[in-house]
Amino acid sequence: IESEYLTPGAVLRIGGSLLVYCEIDLPQAMAAFAPLPRASLARLRAEALIDTVAPSELPVLIQGPTGAGKELLATRVHQKSGRKGALVAVNCSTFSKELIGSELFGHVAGAFSGAASNRTGLFAAANEGTLFLDEIADLPLEQQPALLRAMQEKKIRPVGSDKELAVDARVVAASHKKLSELTTAGNFRADL
């Protein structure tokens, strides 16, 4: 193709990358970033992309260096998504390896030593809202299948329970690490 006119929302595939064409109203986009000291063109582009992806039900991955504003972008995705529930944010690097399942999916009383009562997990807390998983690359490989199932099937099973619960939590994840490199090294699931 030598030339083609694009309309807003048009999707282009170039090699292994998908690009979405967006038109930006600069004054409106600048207002969205009023709390930030410097509204860069990159942030304005991010806001335009957020306008495109926020209404969908698809999971979102935000990659960038520490301090780049990934949580702010996740908050904007949630705000513009139209979802009624809460935005529940958690940093995956803070999870204890032994309690990740309980943190994400909850547990029933007696499920393990110290589980004296039922506990709602993060997925249930984000029901009808957004679950923001910061530093998703730090989630251990053995816990990734359960996360994938929760995202695909919209069902969770609290630790120690024999019953699944329906949840409608959209996942927005972020990482300063390149997940493609972790996938190649066998440390992160490609399907996640």
What residue spans do the PLM features occupy?
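C-terminal boundary/linker segments immediately following FHA domains
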Residues: 2-39
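AAA+ ATPase active-site-proximal loops
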Residues: 29-166, 171-177, 182-183
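Charged helix-capping and loop-helix junction motifs
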Residues: 185-188
